Amino acid sequence: MLKVDKINSFYGKAHVLRDLSFTVPKGNVVALLGRNGAGKTTTMKSIMQLVRPASGTVTFDGHSIAGSQPHKVAKLGLGYVPEERRIFTDLTVAENLIVGKQPPREGAVTWTEEMLFDLFPNLAERRNNRGKALSGGEQQMLTIARTLMGNPSFV
């Protein structure tokens, strides 16, 4: 389903990812582990095209996504939960979820607000609170929930 083949990514002159290759078959779960600065976040950002690999290929569900715009990668069904909390602080929890909503995708779970409130009961209790009123942990829950509202086939 996801294939990363010999990607090389840089920040300026710093060569962060060197010929990185791996495959994640459909239905598998993979974790990226490593020390600080090992390239875990850069790997995820390179897959999503938030950091453009200088070389190599990234293929998702048979589509080459190297060089694509990040929003087009997301439309293909790749969900991304950023490390840093990314919510709309002036919107309520419920409004943040609505912003992330996408049509159902074949082969993917169709997430609803109620399913996410069952998964994150703290958010259910705060559905009418603005994002800026949430704790850091609740903001991260909301970031994850909003990603799932996009009905990605891969997170």
Task: Identify the meaning behind each predicted range.
Residues V30-A31, Y80:
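Short beta-strand immediately N-terminal to the Walker A/P-loop
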Residues M48:
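Helix-to-loop junction immediately C-terminal to a conserved catalytic motif
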